Amino acid sequence: FMLSLYPLVSSVTNISIQKFARSVAPVQAIGFGTRSSLAALPATYAAADTLDIPEKISGIVLPIAVTLFKFASPLARTTGTYFIAHLYGIDLTPTELIIIAIAIGLLSFYSPGIPSGGLLIMTPVYVSLGLPVEGIGILIAIDLVVDMFLTMANVTANVASSALIAKIQ
């Protein structure tokens, strides 16, 4: 999922895949280790600077992206919801899964950039679907590992969005 950003950035911005990968690697390492997009923000600025993204763009785009743009959340949280529903013997239709993904995508704008912040938005989704809220406790138990990869994808998407907006501007 995250790897789709590399060719996208390369084809739209003329930044080589290697340069993009080298620039975002420190940001990914910090995101992976801290599980916080916010903690990775200084390194994200450094990556944007390495990619020659103008400071007037990165200075606006990156803080907004860290706060609002959760690239990996809808897919991962929908998968977690499907897992919990299956665990409790509840069948979800494809339509319900799409509704879940849309709801999580919209609610992810409100999730904080802190470790496991995306789980905070799950309760309203579970309640509205009649899923057992206790299932979120199971997700919390395994979220340590999952959140590392989600944060890595999110911080990569933050740099990518900054590069794409710089190209448009």
Locations of regions flagged by a protein language model:
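Transmembrane helical segments that form the transport core of multi-pass membrane transport proteins
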Residues: 8, 13-17
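Select transmembrane alpha-helical segments in multipass membrane proteins
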Residues: 24-25, 140
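Entry/N-cap segments of selected transmembrane alpha helices
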Residues: 1-6
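Helix-loop-helix junctions within the multi-pass membrane cores of secondary transporters/permeases
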Residues: 26-108, 158, 162
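Transmembrane alpha-helical segments and their short flanking loops
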Residues: 78-169
